């Protein structure tokens, strides 16, 4: 079972308890809806940073969320650390949070972490670092939980 699919097994009461006790955000915990899930994007968009004095700008939230993208080009292929040009949807906020139209972005590829990638592969990345080649189900779950977190963040900001 993949870890994202396991999120469905976490009871909302446990998530609320974690938010109230560990993050010391009891008011937020009370407002969480039944469809809230403890995905990384939930933490980025809803719960906020663990360190209270850290202010996450919109651009930082885009970097911090786990993104997905399609590899368009591989640069410096012979190096241990190469660059990938990926197409992905950035996170924006106007009145509400949303994923924008696909754009190109350069990210880092540590070949020792993720040895085999090709143009056309879909992968996840975090803080501009390639993390994992995604299977279809992984991609669907990543999109699902990211969108769910966006919807919850927008609902709570009303």
What are these regions (language model features)?
Residues 1-62:
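Anionic-ligand-binding alpha/beta catalytic cores of soluble enzymes and soluble regulatory domains
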Residues 59-76:
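Structural detector for short beta-strands of small beta-barrel domains
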Residues 74-86:
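Short, basic, low-complexity termini and linkers enriched in Ser/Thr/Gly/Pro
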Residues 87-91, 136:
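Surface loops and adjacent helix of pleckstrin homology
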Residues 90-108:
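Short, basic/aromatic beta-hairpin or loop at an interaction surface
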Residues 109-124:
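Short nucleic-acid-contacting surface segments enriched for D/E, G, S/T with interspersed K/R
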Residues 128-141:
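Short, Lys/Arg- and Gly-enriched loop/turn segments at beta-strand edges
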Residues 138-158:
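Short peripheral tails and domain-boundary helices/loops at the edges of structured domains
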């Amino acid at each position: 079972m993949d870890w994202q699919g396991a999120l469905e097994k976490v009871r909302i009461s446990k998530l609320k308890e974690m938010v109230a006790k560990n993050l010391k955000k009891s008011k937020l915990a009370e407002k969480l809806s039944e469809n809230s899930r403890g995905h990384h994007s939930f933490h980025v968009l809803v719960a906020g940073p663990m360190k209270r004095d850290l202010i996450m700008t919109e651009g930082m939230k885009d970097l911090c969320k786990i993104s997905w993208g399609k590899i368009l080009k591989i640069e410096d292929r012979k190096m241990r650390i190469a660059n990938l040009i990926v197409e992905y949807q950035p996170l924006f906020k106007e009145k509400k949070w949303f994923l924008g139209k696909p754009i190109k972005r350069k990210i880092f590829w540590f070949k020792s972490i993720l040895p085999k990638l090709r143009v056309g592969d879909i992968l996840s990345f975090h803080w501009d670092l390639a993390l994992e080649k995604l299977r279809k189900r992984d991609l669907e779950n990543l999109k699902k939980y990211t969108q769910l977190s966006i919807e919850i963040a927008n609902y709570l900001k009303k």
